[in-house]
Amino acid sequence: MVGANIYNTHNIHDPNNLNNLNNINNPNNITNNMHNPHNIFQNNYFDPKQLKILVDNMTPQDLELLLTLSCKKGIIRDVEYILCRIMREMINININYGLCQAIENYHLKIVELLIDHGADINYNNGLPLNLAVKNGYYDIIELLIEKKVNTNDNIFQLLTHCCQNNLPNSLRILLKENISIDPIYSTMVNLCLDNGYAECASILINHNNSDSTINSESMIHDTNLTTSQTLLELDDLLELDDLLDGNDYFNYNQDESDVGDDAENDIENDIEDDN
């Protein structure tokens, strides 16, 4: 995991640092107790006074650690205060670890906050987007795309992941980039159909039909490709008709209020089916 080493308390190694357990003389002293690194890991929430003392006296290395842990736990107040000190004193730390932890643990507001404070959405070869797609967090995917995340390097891998794991909302948002899926179209559609993922298959077919219409002038010069696509789409539509069993996924429009993650929606659908 990226940045996993920062969770190791042994990284707090400076013997002159207040974090060193040997420097804690008075157990009743709030400052010393708070600088015990074990307290940082065990406490889920600091009161405002504790937080101020802790953050204002931390070294950059420990500040980075606390920021990352706060992002992981989703404690937005702590994240805001830490970022305030970082910006005020122009402290140079890596806030991208925190961004990845916030995405992995689905803390949308913290993701927005970190991006607004300069976190790199293309960090580590697109890890933020990869994490969002892996977990099916389509509102985070949408946020990253709105912020102009780079989707050029691994878009086909991301789309394939959506098809393999039946993530229709994530797939739909990624395809809003108006990309051509010709190189992997047949593979992805067949993958969806083989697994019974009708909605994902219909999204791909609709996108490809729309893309073919937009680029019809260029496709005239590629007769073989157009013919093979047409034959594939006819077969796909017949198979989809059996899968859908009368359900109209082709005219599906996502409700603007429908936010969350694909995995959560799948669970809700299963519950409804059981009832």
Swiss-Prot record:
Biased composition (Acidic residues): 255-275
Pfam families documented for this protein: Ank_2 (PF12796)
SMART domains with a match to the protein in the record: ANK (SM00248)
Record has Nucleotide-binding as a keyword: no
Gene3D superfamilies reported for this sequence: Ankyrin repeat-containing domain
Native source species: Acanthamoeba polyphaga mimivirus
InterPro entries named in the record: Ankyrin_rpt (IPR002110), Ankyrin_rpt-contain_sf (IPR036770), Multifunctional_ANK_Repeat (IPR051165)
Region described as Disordered: 253-275
ANK repeat placement: 94-123, 124-153, 155-183, 184-213
Keywords in alphabetical order: ANK repeat, Repeat
Keyword Repeat found: yes
PROSITE patterns per UniProt: ANK_REP_REGION (PS50297), ANK_REPEAT (PS50088)
Name of the protein in question: Putative ankyrin repeat protein L715
